[in-house]
């Protein structure tokens, strides 16, 4: 799984921009949030934060086993406290409606795409249709975000 995540993210070192990666201790249920200062390799933090029970095994970091940060909170928007702009991309938001941090903009599947996402998962045609619908939704979401987004120079 570590190698898969390394290939997926295409980077070995933490970015210069602030990045917080949440996970959950598999034994205690305690949440943890890693950043560049934590001393955890980026790829290992990403792998731990995406180790969902039943799909991937927990990932060991500093002798502890960790699971997907979504088990802490599906969106983790509380980690963005103080941010000017927060964008939450949650294509499955229709399954588990929840509130987001004040000011956060939620990008979710429209009703038609949601139906496709909920279709029979073993049908490759359903995946293709869901992918195409997601691409179309991304274009609409980009326009919505463009209308809301203000560059730092416009914030005063």
Predicted features and spans:
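Patatin-like phospholipase
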Residues: 1-156
């Amino acid at each position: 799984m570590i190698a898969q995540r390394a290939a997926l993210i295409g980077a070995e070192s933490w970015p210069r921009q602030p990045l917080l990666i949440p996970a959950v201790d598999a034994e205690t249920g305690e949440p943890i949030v890693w950043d560049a200062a934590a001393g955890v390799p980026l790829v290992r933090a990403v792998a731990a934060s995406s180790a969902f029970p039943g799909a991937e095994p927990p990932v060991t970091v500093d002798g502890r086993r960790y699971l997907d940060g979504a088990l802490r909170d599906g969106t983790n928007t509380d980690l963005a406290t103080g941010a000017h702009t927060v964008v939450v991309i949650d294509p499955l938001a229709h399954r588990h409606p929840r509130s987001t941090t004040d000011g956060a903009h939620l990008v979710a599947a429209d009703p038609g795409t949601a139906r496709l996402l909920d279709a029979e998962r073993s049908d490759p045609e359903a995946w293709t249709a869901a992918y195409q619908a997601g691409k179309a939704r991304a274009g609409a979401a980009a326009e919505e975000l463009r209308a809301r987004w203000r560059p730092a120079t416009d914030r005063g």
